[in-house]
């Protein structure tokens, strides 16, 4: 059986930040980080077009969680996954956040979920460390 090494892969997830009293500045900073990403036309694996940018003026006063979602489809991104993760981690280093989740769905090796967690209560740009763990689920079919 010949394998298709250029099978479609889908990457999606979200970055969450719980805003506090200085939340508006954090939201502006996060927005600048997302807008500073390269365009999809640059062939960057992580690019600004894959993100849904939350509007700064539209927020529910009942909640304080900023959710920045993203998604894209690729041909065989799992073969360049090291580089995708490096680019995503570089973005996270520039942002305020409390957690991030990335799902990688591949036709060949199932679903991988990457969970990014701060080492404290909040990741501060260029100052805080974070950890990542991977969970793998493969369809038995």
Which role fits each region the language model picked out?
Residues 1-34:
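Short, extreme N-terminal segment that most often corresponds to the first beta-strand
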Residues 28-141:
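Charged interaction segments
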């Amino acid at each position: 059986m010949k394998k298709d090494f250029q099978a479609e892969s889908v990457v999606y997830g979200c970055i969450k930040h719980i805003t506090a009293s200085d939340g508006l500045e954090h939201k502006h900073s996060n927005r600048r980080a997302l807008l500073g990403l390269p365009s999809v036309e640059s062939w960057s694996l992580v690019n600004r077009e894959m993100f849904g940018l939350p509007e700064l003026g539209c927020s529910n006063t009942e909640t304080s969680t900023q959710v920045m979602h993203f998604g894209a489809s690729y041909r065989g991104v799992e073969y360049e996954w090291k580089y995708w993760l490096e680019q995503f981690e570089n973005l996270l280093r520039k942002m305020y956040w409390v957690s991030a989740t990335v799902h990688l769905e591949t036709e060949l090796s199932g679903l991988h979920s990457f969970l990014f967690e701060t080492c404290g209560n909040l990741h501060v740009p260029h100052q805080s460390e974070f950890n990542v763990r991977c969970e793998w689920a493969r369809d038995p079919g």
